[in-house]
Amino acid sequence: MRANSPTQGISLKMHQARPLFLVTVALQLIGLGYSYQSEGDGAREVSNILSPVIPGTTLDRTLSNSSRKNDIPEGARLWDSLPDSSTLGESAVPVSRCCHNGGTCVLGSFCVCPAYFTGRYCEHDQRRRDCGALGHGAWTLHSCRLCRCIFSALYCLPHQTFSHCDLKSFLSSGARGSRECSIPSLLLLVLCLLLQGVAGKG
């Protein structure tokens, strides 16, 4: 076998380009973090992208069966508050049996769910997916927390520290930060492609 085979050359070139790619990704993440931190209260107005407007009573009516714990708004659940959960939307194993809604427990660890039910413990009814006016999978800002509607339950991200709880300024800060980072990111990408092309010819 020859020492300088074509596949070895390609492998070496890819190995040389990998650090450039990692540096590019790291710089983009750092830039996004700085743009979020440097935003002020003078955020620009967002023009008409906030539809539909969700009144608080719509979600409260739909999710009124949840309890209020540790200053968590009623109808919202924290993702990190699920004790035995590694994925979004799972709940802890029920004390009496492992399955809800008539599911069949198999080997004490998973469930065979009847029609219209899904989830590890058959806890999600596929016929009830929306949170009032908020559709399944949609994100919203609820009581200064970023929340997502999943199978008619509102799950909220924990420990968010916003300087303000205004949805318009929150959305405009993300849009402004991504525009500020787009030109340097594009230049860095072009530089990496040029360096990869030069390394490929050499």
Swiss-Prot record:
GO terms, biological process: anterior/posterior pattern specification; atrial septum morphogenesis; coronary vasculature development; determination of left/right symmetry; digestive tract morphogenesis; endoderm development; female pregnancy; gastrulation
PROSITE patterns: EGF_1, EGF_3
Keywords: Cell membrane, Developmental protein, Disulfide bond, EGF-like domain, Gastrulation, Glycoprotein, GPI-anchor, Lipoprotein, Membrane, Secreted, Signal
Disruption phenotype: Positional defects in internal organs. The lung presents a right pulmonary isomerism. The stomach is located on either the left or the right and the spleen is small and has an abnormal shape. The apex of the heart pointed to the right or left. In addition malpositioning of heart outflow tracts is observed, the aorta is connected to the right ventricle and emerged from the heart in a ventral position and to the right of the pulmonary artery. This one is connected to either the left or the right ventricle.
A cellular component annotation (GO) from this entry: side of membrane
Residues linked to a lipid group, GPI-anchor amidated aspartate type: 166
Modifications after synthesis and translation: N-glycosylated.
Disulphide connectivity of cysteines: 98-105, 99-111, 113-122
GO molecular function ontology, one term from the record: activin receptor binding
Alphabetical list of InterPro entries matching this protein: Cryptic/Cripto_CFC-dom, EGF-like_dom
EGF-like domain location: 94-123
Recorded superkingdom: Eukaryota
Gene3D superfamilies linked to this entry: Laminin (2.10.25.10)
Residue ranges annotated as propeptide in the record: 167-202
Tissue note: No expressed in adult tissues.
Coarse class of the protein's main subcellular location: membrane
Function: Nodal coreceptor involved in the correct establishment of the left-right axis. May play a role in mesoderm and/or neural patterning during gastrulation.
Family: Belongs to the EGF-CFC (Cripto-1/FRL1/Cryptic) family.
Protein name from the UniProt record: Cryptic protein
Biological source species: Mus musculus (Mouse)
